[in-house]
């Protein structure tokens, strides 16, 4: 038989006998590599090592260091989970069990209601299956045969999945010991490869995500190649749980979500203090970058949303109402309102660039199951801005937006990486304009010396964009900021300006948001700082702790002076021991605690403690007062 040739990532070509599998090929390359390889990327597709080589294909072998390798190992872990459940509860019916980001899950239909204690039993059975090191084999069968096969096993969900496939489909299954599952793969060679795993939680999940269908039991888990990696990940999760903004939001009195308004957060006084500081900072930065602030209405007519395209493409996410027998909608986005502000007057080329910024409250109908603290809500404030400009101003304006983003993220010690998302298949607009817009984004980010990666085809249909992914103190990334060149709304709304030639032209429009959502950003910062906010942001900046009742008057006089200069201060005048008061203030994560007793009253001093336990000792009150005012003003 003729040889087949494959191309490796370094560009080199390797030839093998026809019929050679990917798994056999990697052994020829390196035995040590073969022990680590879990799957392969063939012409951009994640592929099972059991598959035969295809002549001329580009092949990259994947280990656990690669996303495809992680996906494959965790997919196999989900099958081991399913096999363990079937051993323990043979009557259980299996639905789906994919790998997901950071782990895997399996949806199961069974009479027994799973408990956290059951997870331990399942893990023990999974460990037995791993120890058995069962070879994993792939088989295929015609569609009708597969339907009959799974019907005989009473696996109704598998039958439904197969019935949705075309009649000529070839159905693939994977087996390990006496367990077989419908699956497209890929999977690792044997169950023994999955050495480090942990089942994490149980949740409810509707079959196929449809609340009209039966509620199944979903078991979540994760898997790693090495136990040390699993332990490190679980430690990270423990730390993240301590920092959960929902938990800290309640403990610190920042916000609450009531059953009367699911997805609609209430900001409490301390939460508003924090929020106001963020908004003040936002306004200062935008003032420095020559933005003008606007505010647009929350409710606007159906006609506007038809023009913008939201009525046809986003209506299911919008809240609507009737006013004077006409349909209106609560805005899900600020952009159309910003366009109306632009259209309030005819503009000349001399007016550009125009920079309009808005902290605009928007509402979107999210499914109740998707709601999550401040991270996923139904009402939130977007820090949107729309920059209207001439074509030759595009790169300069983009660079200014990039500078603005850097200034804001740097204030919070947030590292970030940037992705340039390019033209998708369903793009609207002229190819030349797309190329010019993409090139302008690329040139701007390169001119600022900021590393970025290309995210091909992931731009919006109306324009390319820069997506900012910020990294918090635990190393987790969050997609926040977006800089978008919008070629859709200017066209839909027919916005114009009078050019130097006296003719009407269409301006270029940048749509950008840095925080993304004020609520979500507050949630991220709460977890980033573990609730111990910098002094300028802290809801309570100073807590004065009188040792006894006779020191309360002095404490209140100090608080009065600080309050007059807008320092957020509280006095703990309860009849409690000073050690208890200090612990309570530490738990409230107040940046500064001032202990006052006889000595302090007599000398006009305060004994200063910082959150975290540092004792700064006794200092004159005026000295402390001046230093904290500078710290707050300079946002150190």
Where are these regions (language model features)?
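NTP/phosphate- and nucleic-acid-binding module
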Residues: 1-75, 80-95, 100-636
